[in-house]
């Protein structure tokens, strides 16, 4: 399970070091094999342990090819997917096209989302988080969440 928000830095070569608390889990789950792709709704990347990505990819491929929305989703998620491998220091090299999409430069934020991670530019993350908090205050709690105890 991946959770928490971690502020990190990209090195000059575009490598990101996974925090040590995630490395052993990633090595156990997928031998350090991770897939990165774009988030089509937000300016960030999504990083999946390889087995979780393979399940998602199978589901994406099963979508009807004559459905324009399904084809668009397949093109965006599968088309931008890159296989990454943790090196001996727990780092992955993020391909330039993915860094460009998410505007990743030096300061980045890794956000655990249980079975995957999101990777954000630090400024974009701060702005999005502020916007989400403002929206949550204005919108209130959806009915579906009314029974949760936080």
Curated annotation (Swiss-Prot):
Which keywords does the record carry? Cytoplasm, DNA-binding, Repeat, Transcription, Transcription regulation
Superkingdom of this entry's organism?
Bacteria
Which Gene Ontology biological process is one annotated for this entry?
negative regulation of DNA-templated transcription initiation
Matching entries from CDD domains are given as: MraZ_C, MraZ_N
Q: Where are the transmembrane segments?
A: none
Gene3D superfamilies with a match to the protein in the record = Transcriptional regulator MraZ domain (3.40.1550.20)
Where is the protein situated, by its record's location annotation? Cytoplasm, Nucleoid
- The SpoVT-AbrB domain extends over 5-52, 81-124
Q: Which GO terms describe its cellular component?
A: cytoplasm; nucleoid
Output the Gene Ontology terms for molecular function. Answer: DNA-binding transcription factor activity; transcription cis-regulatory region binding
Subcellular location, principal:
cytoplasm
InterPro entries, alphabetically? MraZ, MraZ_C, MraZ_dom, MraZ_N, MraZ_sf, SpoVT-AbrB_dom, SpoVT-AbrB_sf
Subunit annotation: Forms oligomers.
**PANTHER family according to UniProt:** TRANSCRIPTIONAL REGULATOR MRAZ (PTHR34701:SF1)
Return the HAMAP family for the record: MraZ
Family stated for the protein in its record: Belongs to the MraZ family.
Q: What is this protein called?
A: Transcriptional regulator MraZ
Species per Swiss-Prot/TrEMBL record:
Alkalilimnicola ehrlichii (strain ATCC BAA-1101 / DSM 17681 / MLHE-1)
High-level lineage:
Bacteria, Pseudomonadati, Pseudomonadota, Gammaproteobacteria, Chromatiales
């Amino acid at each position: 399970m991946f959770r928490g928000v971690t502020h990190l830095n990209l090195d000059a070569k575009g490598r990101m070091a996974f925090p040590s608390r995630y490395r052993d889990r990633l090595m156990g789950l997928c031998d350090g094999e991770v897939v990165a792709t774009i988030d089509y709704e937000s300016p960030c990347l999504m990083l999946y342990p390889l087995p979780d990505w393979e399940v998602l990819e199978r589901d994406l491929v099963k979508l009807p090819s004559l459905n324009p929305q399904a084809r668009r989703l397949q093109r965006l998620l599968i088309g931008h997917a890159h296989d990454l491998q943790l090196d001996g220091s727990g780092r992955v090299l993020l391909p330039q096209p993915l860094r460009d999409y998410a505007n990743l430069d030096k300061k980045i934020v890794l956000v655990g989302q249980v079975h995957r991670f999101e990777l954000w530019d630090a400024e974009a993350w701060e702005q999005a988080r502020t916007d989400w908090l403002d929206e949550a205050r204005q919108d209130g709690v959806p009915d579906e969440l009314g029974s949760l105890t936080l």
